Curated annotation (Swiss-Prot):
The gene is yidC. Residues 28-45 have a biased composition (Polar residues). GO terms for biological process: protein insertion into membrane; protein transport. This is Membrane protein insertase YidC. Keywords: Cell inner membrane, Cell membrane, Chaperone, Membrane, Protein transport, Transmembrane, Transmembrane helix, Transport. Interacts with the Sec translocase complex via SecD. Specifically interacts with transmembrane segments of nascent integral membrane proteins during membrane integration. Its main location: membrane. One of its GO terms (molecular function) is membrane insertase activity. The keyword Cell inner membrane applies.
């Protein structure tokens, strides 16, 4: 197999990979209710106390009496009716590259609802079919002050001698928000409550594009399952209802995630459901009994922010797995760590990608050299193989035997030119996912006209240069292909690749371009070495 056939193999493998992942995203029917306005009410969102995952009857009790909570990285809007987070702005991330507006992860708008809810159900709960508690606050705006590392925002409600205090606890430079329920029972009898925390979002499908497939939907982690996606289609087909001591429930989208993590040593209930065009995923903490004259605090943590692996891993076990590298995670994860380490030194993600390319291609150089050497030996055998075919004609069995004897005599592995390519493809695919899933590349500039490595090149300069580099590799590579159709396909291959890469994120195109430049340099060195051995001629 010669170099040009290798290029064809790479193209077929790569395009097949893209088509497969897109089919994998699209092979299920579209969920219902996408893009339509839903009539939503807060009390109808409250899960039942029974733990069966079914909602209680809807009731019209909604409020927009809001308070705002601001830190250095988060701006939250909280409804005082129940204390739901109905908006979350990520202050360190712009909505668009050229926009000064912050990215809004959670929002509650007509036709587009994505909020984080929490409350108390049970015999003495304050969130039920009859309505939700109107919580009292001391101010409308709360801000983390300069020099302050923690902000606590209490919201209170008093009923039947019991004081319920819902407190949002936020820390500087953190996307983890602790939600505490303190129940001070000064009544004459014991009180029984159960805390729930859930995420609610419109049922929708966001599979991205062929070149950048993305997932939008649910996910969870339990004692027995580190990480599993549970799509909106899954929620409509079957509601989850499972018990776990450790775990979390989350909603995912490209680059960002929201998740509830119960803070309880006892088993919690993890559930999903779909109702009225909305999908829910959440957790119920175990039922708690508070004796008369005592108080107790129940806590769950809300992660609402970007997919930052180190920070998420510190917040909850396996939450970092929401950065989904697919089945090649064991390659992609170390590549991302190496990329991040390089960026911490050079200070630019584009330069880090270039450096990573040099490191990866340098590590694979022995394979590349073995590949070119094997192909050169195969070319030297072509006259003998041609003569053998003419001599043996249609006797395929004898032809196969004599070919194997010739390969053994000349110490040539007929798969030697193909195997290195097959071994290199998983590395490229893993790097592809590493770059696609890295929120750090979002809106990160390179040089000149590249202002966002996660977006396509606005002027298509990098894809065109990549196409030119592929064409140069072809021209430098000797070939034994004589079939006119194969020659046309190989000539067209750089054009096809250039077209595909027009729509790829510029960070990935940069990797491929630099990789091609390295290939040209390695080809030159290897061919010079082969010339000295008489295995290559210019």
């Amino acid at each position: 197999m010669d170099s040009q056939r290798n290029i064809l193999l790479i193209a077929l493998l790569f395009v097949s990979f893209l088509l497969y992942q897109q089919w994998n995203m699209d092979n299920s029917p579209q969920p219902q209710g996408q893009g339509t306005e839903q009539q939503v009410n807060n009390s109808g969102d409250v899960p039942s106390h029974s733990g069966d995952g079914q909602p209680i009857p809807d009731q019209e009790t909604t409020s927009k009496d809001l308070i705002t909570i601001n830190t250095d990285v988060l701006a939250l809007s909280v409804d005082t009716l129940g204390g739901d987070v109905i908006e979350a702005k990520l202050l360190a991330y712009n909505n668009e590259l050229d926009s000064a507006d912050s990215f809004i992860l959670l929002k509650d708008e007509p036709g587009l609802s994505y909020i984080a809810q929490s409350g108390l159900i049970g015999a003495n709960g304050i969130d039920s079919a009859n309505g939700r508690a109107q919580l009292a606050v001391t101010a409308k705006d709360f801000t983390l002050a300069d020099g302050q590392d923690e902000l606590r925002v209490p919201m209170t409600y008093v009923k039947d001698g019991i004081t319920y205090t819902k407190t949002f606890v936020l820390k500087r430079n953190s996307y983890a928000v602790d939600v505490e329920y303190t129940i001070d029972n000064q009544s004459a009898s014991a009180a029984s409550v159960q805390m729930y925390a859930q995420l609610r979002q419109n049922l929708m499908d966001d599979g991205g594009s062929l070149t950048m497939p993305t997932y939008r939907g649910g996910a969870y982690s339990t004692d027995t399952t580190n990480y599993k996606k549970y799509s909106f289609d899954d929620m409509q087909d079957k509601s989850l209802n499972m018990t776990t001591t450790n775990g979390w429930a989350a909603m995912l989208q490209h680059y960002f995630v929201s998740a509830w993590i119960p803070r309880s040593e006892e088993a919690s209930n993890l559930y999903t459901r779909a109702s009225n065009g909305l999908g829910y995923i959440g957790v119920r903490l175990p039922t708690t009994t508070i004796a008369a004259g005592t108080e107790q605090t129940l806590t769950a943590t809300l992660w609402v922010g970007p997919k930052l692996q180190k920070e998420m891993e510190a917040t909850a076990a396996n939450l970092n797995l929401t950065v989904d590298y697919g089945w090649l995670w064991f390659i992609a994860s170390p590549l991302h760590k190496l990329l991040s380490f390089i960026q911490s030194i050079v200070g630019n993600w584009g330069l880090a990608i270039m450096m990573l390319t040099f490191i990866v291609r340098g590590a694979m150089y022995p394979l590349t050299k073995a590949q070119y050497t094997s192909m050169a030996k195969m070319r030297m055998l072509q006259p003998k193989l041609t003569a053998m075919r003419e001599r043996l004609g249609d006797d395929r069995q004898r032809m196969s035997q004599e070919m194997m004897e010739l390969y053994k005599k000349e110490k040539v592995n007929p798969l030697g030119g193909c195997l290195p390519i097959v071994l290199q493809m998983p590395i490229f695919i893993a790097l592809y996912w590493s770059l696609m899933e890295s929120v750090e590349l979002r809106h990160s500039p390179f040089f000149g006209w590249i202002h966002d490595l996660s977006a396509q090149d606005p002027y298509y300069i990098l894809p065109l240069l990549m196409g030119v580099s592929m064409f140069m590799i072809q021209k430098m590579s000797p070939t034994t292909v004589t079939d006119p159709m194969q020659q046309k396909i190989m000539t067209f291959m750089p054009v096809m690749f250039t077209f595909f890469f027009l729509f790829f994120p510029s960070g990935l195109v940069l990797y491929w371009l630099v990789s091609n430049v390295v290939t040209l340099l390695q080809q030159t060195l290897i061919y010079r070495s082969l010339e000295k051995k008489g295995l290559h001629t210019k």
